[in-house]
């Protein structure tokens, strides 16, 4: 019979990693989603600055619904329900928004000549103006965590 003292962490490394990934993503998405949901006008302005769609009604719907999708997915990750599905949606959002952040930063770099990592703008993530390189690294780490959850064997 194995002693609890011999194994202070009852979870194995894989399940502990999954637990940490769920909680990091869950907390981030609940916090940032609520921040956007409470300030939909600021989020709408930030999304409009990307210039990827001109239809105000469509952008208004995005600003109204996307934050709640983030909160919902974050909550699912925190409680451990539909983890792979929630992680897949989070993965898709991160890839899409990282792509448009990169595209906007490259446009700013080309038109102004500002060093790429010195570019700062409100990406719409709920934190105000951020340095683009820092945001892209942060998104890459969150994307890796979400992909790990999507590809995990445990359901």
Segments (PLM) and residue ranges:
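Membrane-interfacial helix-loop segments of redox and metal-homeostasis proteins
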Residues: 2-155
């Amino acid at each position: 019979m194995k002693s609890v003292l011999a194994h202070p962490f009852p979870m194995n490394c894989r399940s502990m990693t999954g637990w940490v990934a769920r909680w990091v993503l869950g907390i981030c998405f609940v916090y940032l989603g609520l921040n956007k949901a409470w300030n939909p006008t600021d989020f709408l302005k930030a999304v409009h600055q990307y210039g990827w769609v001109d239809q105000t009604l469509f952008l208004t719907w995005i600003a109204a619904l996307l934050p709640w999708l983030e909160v919902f997915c974050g909550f699912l990750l925190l409680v451990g329900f539909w983890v792979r599905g929630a992680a897949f949606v989070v993965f898709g959002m991160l890839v899409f928004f990282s792509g448009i952040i990169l595209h906007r930063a490259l446009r700013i770099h080309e038109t102004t000549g500002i060093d790429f990592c010195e570019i700062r703008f409100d990406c719409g993530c709920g934190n105000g103006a951020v340095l683009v390189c820092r945001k892209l690294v942060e998104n890459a780490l969150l994307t890796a965590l979400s992909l790990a959850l999507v590809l995990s064997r445990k359901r």
